[in-house]
Amino acid sequence: MRGNPLIHLLAISFLCILSMVYSQLCPAPCACPWTPPQCPPGVPLVLDGCGCCRVCARRLGESCDHLHVCDPSQGLVCQPGAGPSGRGAVCLFEEDDGSCEVNGRRYLDGETFKPNCRVLCRCDDGGFTCLPLCSEDVRLPSWDCPRPRRIQVPGRCCPEWVCDQAVMQPAIQPSSAQGHQLSALVTPASADGPCPNWSTAWGPCSTTCGLGIATRVSNQNRFCQLEIQRRLCLSRPCLASRSHGSWNSAF
């Protein structure tokens, strides 16, 4: 079967162009230094893109080209257009599966895990979000326990409320000033009277990057009653591309 002569001519021309480009990028014969380069600890020696000389493999986030190849043992490939402002090539993971790494352990995208007994986390697109497992309830001062406080009980995960024995008061009728101060936290303030401020500190942001939600317990509302309040938070901007993030010091 005879082919089109024009197609044959184009194919031959294309092969000639490829051979010219290859000869410019990869000179023949190979010219390598007598001594191999000294690589940083943990960086292996690999053959360059021309298959001639041994070079230090490029690591995650480092620039790469036809000679300086990425570390194949780490699953890195040279991604064109991934450099600053979309220019140049950078070593990235071959398959960005959205997994995340916490305390040296890798979790799959969508997998839930407990870094400790106080929080439940979920791996989500290279980052992770966590929810508290310990109760955020608030114990108000009372006549028999005017100063409640949280303590860490041995053998228990979540802190518990106890009454400080050093300040325990006998079961007597409190003074009018003390009674007014304590009852103001329990009963709603009148429309004309001010609301005494009783608020906990804002909790951590629910996400490691991008917009998240932080919570606290406060009585700063129109009814002067304790409630869980929420607000938007931003820990840091998310990267444009997903990365295998590690947050070993988070817990």
From Swiss-Prot:
Residue intervals passing through the bilayer: none
Provide the IGFBP N-terminal domain boundaries: 24-103
GO molecular-function term, one example from the UniProt record: growth factor activity
Disulfide bonds, which pairs? 26-50, 30-52, 32-53, 39-56, 64-78, 70-100
Q: Where in the cell is it found?
A: Secreted
Instruction: Name the PROSITE patterns for this protein.
Output: IGFBP_N_1, IGFBP_N_2, TSP1, VWFC_1, VWFC_2
InterPro entries in the cross-refs? CCN, Growth_fac_rcpt_cys_sf, IGFBP-like, Insulin_GF-bd_Cys-rich_CS, TSP1_CCN, TSP1_rpt, TSP1_rpt_sf, VWF_dom
Main location (coarse class): secreted
Chain ranges of the TSP type-1 domain: 195-239
User: Which keywords annotate this record?
Assistant: Cell adhesion, Disulfide bond, Glycoprotein, Secreted, Signal
Q: Name one GO cellular component term.
A: plasma membrane
* Every VWFC domain range: 98-164
Give a short account of what the protein does: May play an important role in modulating bone turnover. Promotes the adhesion of osteoblast cells and inhibits the binding of fibrinogen to integrin receptors. In addition, inhibits osteocalcin production.
The name on file for this protein is CCN family member 5
Native species? Mus musculus
